[in-house]
């Protein structure tokens, strides 16, 4: 039986790597980091070293994820977090998406992503930002579902 995971996802302006390395020094565990360049998500040369996704998994199972926000997107302090839903159960995760979006809005449609998974972002009717990642055929190595490549 596959399971889904819910985790906090933090957003930063050019400091995700430093923040996640700090959190790793506090909580321990394994930290995976992927850059914009690795996933080819930006053509802006100044963004290639930015963190597209990072995932810290502590020895006791806590999970914290983070990324740098692209330059074209505003980052408002105090709203720099989302909730990530990820896993392999496509029907279950689509069901969560369908319920969460009622009265809310899709910020990015739930569709095929560059890393092979299905990915989407929405804001629910209470203003909470959600990211949904459904593992593709490769087994969930996408940004919000598995350990990012280092």
Regions found by a protein language model. Name each.
Residues 46-47, 76-78:
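Short glycine/proline-enriched turns and hinge-like loops at secondary-structure junctions
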Residues 2-6, 32-34, 52-57, 62-68, ...:
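Vicinal oxygen chelate
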Residues 10-61:
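Core segments of cupin and vicinal oxygen chelate
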């Amino acid at each position: 039986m596959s399971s889904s995971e819910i985790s906090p996802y933090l957003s930063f302006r050019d400091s995700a790597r430093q923040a996640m390395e700090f959190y790793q020094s506090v909580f321990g565990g394994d930290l995976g980091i992927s850059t914009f360049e690795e996933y080819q998500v930006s053509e802006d040369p100044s963004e290639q070293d930015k963190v597209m996704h990072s995932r810290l998994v502590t020895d006791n199972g806590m999970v914290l994820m983070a990324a740098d926000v692209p330059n074209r997107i505003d980052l408002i302090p105090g709203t720099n977090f989302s909730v990530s839903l990820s896993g392999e159960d496509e029907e279950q995760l689509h069901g969560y998406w369908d319920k969460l979006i009622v009265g809310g809005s899709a910020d990015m449609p739930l569709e095929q992503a560059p890393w092979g998974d299905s990915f989407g972002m929405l804001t629910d009717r209470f203003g909470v930002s959600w990211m949904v990642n459904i593992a593709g055929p490769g087994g969930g190595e996408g940004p919000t579902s598995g350990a990012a490549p280092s």
